[in-house]
């Protein structure tokens, strides 16, 4: 028996959030690092791969003895949930059991009704070169506080592995 478990939720931005898009070319005076946006609506969005990668990184920091440069060296429970490109003893690559969908904004009307016209803001920052003490100003676009994004995660459960399923769901829930 094989089944899929759907995990749904809402991610609320508590402070300005930047998940960057391409900044291959920036005109003078333009934002140096724009936010990734939904091509249909031009609203900020969160790629599922970004959340999945962040989840894996945080869990790897918690469960690995040392931070691994290569994700194939993660502990077995993380590789079982998120996959590994390393072949096992049978020559099989371990596929991810988790699918994280792209997250789109779900409260645009609520934000507009509060009199807020834009869903992003531009934050001016400085990075200072430690050796020369020269400031390098830059502009970062961020999704504003209060935006909400729908989360949809699918976990692929395999029959006969009930103990693993419980452990995997607990791991994802962290």
Mark where each language-model region is.
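RNA-binding basic/glycine-rich loop and surface signature characteristic of RAMP-family CRISPR effectors
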Residues: 1-128, 132-174
């Amino acid at each position: 028996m094989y089944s899929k478990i759907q995990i749904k939720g809402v991610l609320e931005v508590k402070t300005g959030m930047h998940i960057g898009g391409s900044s291959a070319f920036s005109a003078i005076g333009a934002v140096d690092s724009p936010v990734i946006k939904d091509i249909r609506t031009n609203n900020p969005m969160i790629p599922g791969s970004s959340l999945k990668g962040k989840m894996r990184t945080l869990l790897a920091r918690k469960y690995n003895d040392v931070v691994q440069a290569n994700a194939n060296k993660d502990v077995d429970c993380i590789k079982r949930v998120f996959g590994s490109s390393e072949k096992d003893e049978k020559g099989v690559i371990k596929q991810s059991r988790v699918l994280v969908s792209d997250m789109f904004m779900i409260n645009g009307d609520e934000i507009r009704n509060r009199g807020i016209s834009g869903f992003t803001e531009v934050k001016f920052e400085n990075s200072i070169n430690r050796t020369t003490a020269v400031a390098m100003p830059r502009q970062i676009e961020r999704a504003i506080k209060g935006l909400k994004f729908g989360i949809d995660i699918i976990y692929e459960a395999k029959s006969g592995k009930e103990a693993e399923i419980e452990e995997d769901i607990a791991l994802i829930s962290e």
